[in-house]
Amino acid sequence: MTSTEAGALRRLAPPARRFLAHRKGVLVRLALWSLAESGQAFLVGHAVARSVDEGFLAGDPRRGLLWLGVALVAVLSGARVVRGVFAQLAGVTEPLRDGLVRHAVDRSMARAAPGGPGGTDRAAVSRLTNQVEIARDSFAGLVLTLRSFVFTAAGALLGLLSLHPALLVVVLPPLAAGLALFLVTLRPMAAAQRRALAADEALGEHAASARAALRDLTACGTGPGAERHGADLVADAAAAARTLAGWAAVRTAALGVAGHLPVLALLVAVEWLRGHGVSVGALLGAFTYLVQSLLPALHTLMTALGAAGSRLLVVLDRILGPEPEPEPEPEPEPEPELGSGLEPEPEPASEPESGPSTASASAAAFAVHTAAAPAVELRSVTLSYGVRAEPVLDALDLRVAPGEHLAVVGPSGIGKSTLTRLVAGTLAPSRGEVRVAGRVVTGRPAAELAALRVLVPQDAYVFSGTVGDNLAYLRTDPSPAELDAAVEAFGLAPLVERLGGLDATVRPAELSPGERQLVALVRAYLSPAPLLLLDEATCHLDPASEARAEKALAGRSGTLVVVAHRLSSAVRADRTLVLDGIRAQSGTHAELLGRSPLYRDLTGHWNS
């Protein structure tokens, strides 16, 4: 048995015992009706044997027909027995369903209640409408089949013993061998089934993700990697399916041994049995016990245990098992240096959107070397646009390591731009503290803030002046080589040549939105500020240009925070922050696909 199944059995055994202990009366009545079914199985075979030995072979057809009439009455009485069994079965299965529904509702309510984990329990609907019914049906099927096999087998074996003990010597060994072989296959079969399901789910999820992300895979050139990963998943699924098929073959062999070998053994041993005093009627009665009672019950038992049993175990563990713990956010790895982007000489102050000014010597002195401080740190930051308004950000804690590339994603209007404005210092939090390079940004003069960060908004600002002045707006001393390298890194050379070179005059109205964004991105790239904040600053670029720009910015000394416009930005980042209005989650692209339903939804929307 796998550790998963063993753990599930340990968790479920105590509540199962308590549930059955409170329903002893129903179980006793169910056993009494099942005992009647056992008597029915006994009578049918015994009556057939007597009808032959004491009736037809003895020359008394009336007596033979009378015994056959007894067998017929026993068969017809089965309808009343089945009705009684199902009436008592409801007394066990319906309370189980009611208890599971109550537990699922209580669990969902506790999650949403104050002090609970919080968040929407998206699995609650599945548990209430699907998993509870699966558990009810599977439990009912197992009770019926186990009860039927135990009591029918008891009646049939007792009938064989009453006809002649030698019959048990022939029938019991293959029956026990097949049943033992079947029981041996239960554990590895369940483990193989779990592996096959997991492999199939992983393959389906990858196929759906890849199909939805075709545009981004093509733009980022990651198609071959996705193809290799898909091929590995196909191979894993095929291997799991082969293993499952192998155990299924063993189970089929077990069913054949237990279900057909006793009949064959009885046929082969007819002469031996006749020599030991077994009558013809006893042989026919034995065949009746095997074919009409014992073997059908055994076949039903094996089928139910193989399918409904494992399904019931999994579903009950999901409903009654412990709530999965949320995965902890990965701690940012400390970097040895904050970065050399803070230069000691005076620099241009701020980006156009926060008002142009010039960084003074005091601002440069403020930008000291702080190796231990995070590049960005938010401590229980809350922001709301009014006393009675719902907070846009509520008690947000965030640490971004120096040199880290962080992408921020979430639905429109969730607070992504608000977050960048808070970090940039252009917006003050209602509560909490925002630090950049270890310094509180709220209330700092523009010159000091300009030495720490550059914020590039969605609507890029280009002013009337030369191309070089626009690119070097945040630096006073870029060398021609630095300008040329930056222009080349961002693919801006065709635009510069079209305009007439770095000394040519720019007319902003003649530039497209994407061209203006490229100019603003190069400007931010040349800035000495150690922190770059991009608020959907690449939304007007095509995917290839966006990837090229983000690669250049990520390769720059310092920290990069990007409010993502496309999925590819999150894929390229070291870490992604997901804002959903309730909680914030962070992790790599692969980690968030596994634990954040919202991130999976956004991934589908971005790529559709």
UniProtKB/Swiss-Prot annotation:
Claim: Isomerase is one of the keywords in the record: no
GO biological process, one term: transmembrane transport
Induction text: Probably part of the ramC-ramS-ramA-ramB operon.
Free-text disruption phenotype from the record: Deletion of the ramC-ramS-ramA-ramB operon on rich medium leads to an initially bald (no aerial hyphae) phenotype; after 4 days develops a substantial aerial mycelium. Wild-type mycelium on minimal medium. No expression of SapB, normal expression of chaplins. A complete chaplin-negative plus ram-negative strain (deletion of ramR or the ramC-ramS-ramA-ramB operon) leads to the complete loss of robust aerial hyphae.
Region (Disordered): 321-362
Record-level Gene Ontology MF annotations: ABC-type transporter activity; ATP binding; ATP hydrolysis activity; ATPase-coupled lipid transmembrane transporter activity
Keyword terms, alphabetized: ATP-binding, Cell membrane, Membrane, Nucleotide-binding, Transmembrane, Transmembrane helix, Transport
One of the record's GO cellular component terms: plasma membrane
Signal peptide: none
Topology with respect to the bilayer: Multi-pass membrane protein
Residues covered by the ABC transporter domain: 376-605
Biased composition (Acidic residues): 324-336
Transmembrane segments: 25-45, 66-86, 141-161, 166-186, 253-273
Amino acid composition bias (Low complexity), ranges on this chain: 351-362
Location of this chain's protein in the cell: Cell membrane
Top-level taxon: Bacteria
Residues at which ATP binds: 410-417
Any one Pfam family match given in the protein's UniProt record, by short name: ABC_tran
Residue stretches making up the ABC transmembrane type-1 domain: 30-296
Role noted for this protein: Probably involved in exporting SapB from the cell. Expression of the ram locus (ramA, ramB and ramR) induces rapid aerial mycelium formation in S.lividans.
PANTHER family listed in its UniProt record: ATP-BINDING CASSETTE SUB-FAMILY B, ATP-BINDING CASSETTE SUB-FAMILY B MEMBER 6
Similarity comment: family membership: Belongs to the ABC transporter superfamily.
Name of the molecule in the record: ABC transporter ATP-binding protein RamB
Organism: Streptomyces coelicolor (strain ATCC BAA-471 / A3(2) / M145)
Gene from which this protein is expressed: ramB
